[in-house]
Amino acid sequence: MRVSWETVTRPPKHPFRISRTTGHEAGAERVWVHIECDGVEGWGEADPNSYYGESARTVIAALEQMRSVVEAARGPEALESIERDIERAVNHSRSARAAVSTALHDLVGKRAGLPLWKMWGLSPAEAPQSSFTIGLDEPDVLRRKVEEAAGYPILKVKLGTDRDEEVLRIIRQGAGDKVLRVDANAAWEAEEALEKIAMLADFGVEFVEQPLPPDDRDGYRFLHGKSALPVIVDESCVDSSDIPGLVGLAHGINIKLAKCGGPREGLRMIHTARSCGLQVMIGCMLESTLGIAPAAHLASLVDYADLDGAALLATDPFVGPGLQGAEIRVGDGPGLGVERA
């Protein structure tokens, strides 16, 4: 096998603001990974996020370390052992590992002539609808974003400032009776969160994501018994090893393949969460269709989906599995089923 990569820039349609940043702090620069074997090529995307200490530079450094491990393998089919060897060689840059894992799965599927969902024995028709994310912005821009999301029955609203009630009121007025979900990106403290969540419930919000800092276990324990809404954690749950410790602290987890290390670990997280009685959401970074596709193949296993990353980009250079409106579609193309646009 031969491993190569390229660095590209794909900015969002709008500056993507959340509570801990101003402007689009990550995701514009990404790395596309190619793994070739016997004339067949698998693709993957690394979307590094500075919140996790990653950048295109750290991804490339990790890929340099991974290259020899992958190229020493006889073929891509021994996924478990290859990924185990990669993790031993590189215990950082999960987005780089996710890109390599995705490219390997794509390669195996193409060589077998099967889409990933068939390799995993899944039923794509069971996938939930995806939400569409509304980032923090000024009132007139918020109204325009809600109009742009007309085809989406579920909106995910970013909060975490002193304007939370104003933002939610504007979006509820524009969205009518659509389902609203809220992501605070760890902006609140426990007592504040309890009050904010009561306000969210008054606006008919379905659940709240990551209300507290990732390591505030006492705060999550406090909220778990008092919150008016279910609590889903994102930043508090990086990979499957975090999940058992979240029982009694949260009602569910948000899996992102760029955060956990790829589709193989994502699948492990889903099964671990189910065994712990937790709900499962699958999300994404601001990824192109290439980055979204493996999550789309897994989506039939989850309760909630937020796979709108490619829809938030100014341009998407790929076509394939992802969203058709709010519906998650994967098709029968081999591997990821992704092609250049």
Task: Name the predicted role of every residue range.
Residues V108-R111, H297-L301:
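Alpha-helix C-terminal capping segments
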Residues M1-L180, N185-L194, A198-D202, K226, ...:
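N-terminal capping/lid subdomain adjacent to the active-site entrance of alpha/beta enzymes
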Residues D308-L312:
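Mobile, glycine-enriched helix-loop/loop "lid" segments at the mouths of ligand-binding/catalytic clefts
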Residues D303-D306:
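Short helix/strand-capping turn motifs
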Residues V157, D162-C284, S288-A299, A314-A326:
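Catalytic core of soluble alpha/beta enzymes
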